[in-house]
From Swiss-Prot:
This is Achromobactin transport system permease protein CbrC. Belongs to the binding-protein-dependent transport system permease family. FecCD subfamily. One of its GO terms (biological process) is siderophore-dependent iron import into cell. Keywords: Cell inner membrane, Cell membrane, Ion transport, Iron, Iron transport, Membrane, Transmembrane, Transmembrane helix, Transport. The keyword Cell cycle does not apply. The chain crosses the membrane at residues 32-52, 82-102, 111-131, 138-158, 168-188, 190-210, 216-236, 263-283, 290-310, 325-345. Part of the binding-protein-dependent transport system CbrABCD for uptake of the siderophore achromobactin. Probably responsible for the translocation of the substrate across the membrane. PANTHER family: FERRIC ENTEROBACTIN TRANSPORT SYSTEM PERMEASE PROTEIN, FERRIC ENTEROBACTIN TRANSPORT SYSTEM PERMEASE PROTEIN FEPG.
Amino acid sequence: MDKRGGMDHVLVWRQGRFSRQINLTTVGRVSLALLLVLAVMVASLGVGKLMLSPWEVLRALWSSQPEGAALIVQQLRLPRVVLAALVGGALAVSGLILQAMIRNPLASPDILGITSGASAAAVFYLSFLAATLGAHYLPLAAMIGAATAALAVYWLAWQAGVSPQRLVLTGVGVSALLMAATTFMLVFSPLTTTLSAYVWLTGSVYGASWRETRELGGWLLLIAPWLVLLARQVRVQQLDDGLAQGIGVRVQWLRVALLLLSVALAGAAIAWGGAMAFVGLIAPHIAKRLVAPGFAGQAAMAFLSGAGLVMVADLCGRTLFLPLDLPAGIFVSALGAPFFLYLLIKQRH
């Protein structure tokens, strides 16, 4: 092992012919972000109609008797907070992959039609199938919609390969078409269905249970090995296609693999948390500003940033307008829309 100086402290680990660099500055900042996210989680568990101090929250978490404060924390608040963190983290990493793959800082699941596809499928399910099959299959319908939309965008953008620019333009067009279809279905749906759909379309973790949290957590654990496997390839996508092909990279196959990985992350997050816009745009930019280039460190920071963002948004929705419980997506959009305009202005200059 040896250390290298510079702006960032880097630890180089060597074993035989293999070596690996560990950016100590990145590790430190990710660790600090993790502590901040845990602090937000404790605060979220303590705030509500029944106010609890941090020490009372910790006692409730460790209590083996699910009654009183322990029942509220363990069965009502904790599943919701954990689901919010998983949804935000998955959307953030999905956005990070897309921004690297398309080489566009404005890329996100919203731009490529992933969110619109999930939304259209979810509204279709609520309007025509939920009465027969029940609401349990809504996440599956949303994931199928997200995957179908993404594959349609890729197929329509194909022209002897897919360029990042064509992918974005096609994604915007498909998103607009799917949003129109979603609105059309909402107009002709019963009022109760429309109200349920609007809450889902805004993005909310209201009424989250341990079943939903386990389902999303299990799905993300299945995706994690593929994320690790493709981590080193993400930076290759940031190169010019000709240069990447020159060093032996199968650019189009890699682009398909990364797109499917991004869809798997975003589709699952949207399926269980609703169409929460802008998380996949904001969190990757926070990560890029805080840690050095390198997908592993940026992915960890993006996950924590997205988790914290959605948890804070959900906390605001639960507490700022009591007794109303507003969808977290409202507060994420309130922050994300100005940030998107800022990026547009920055890109122009």
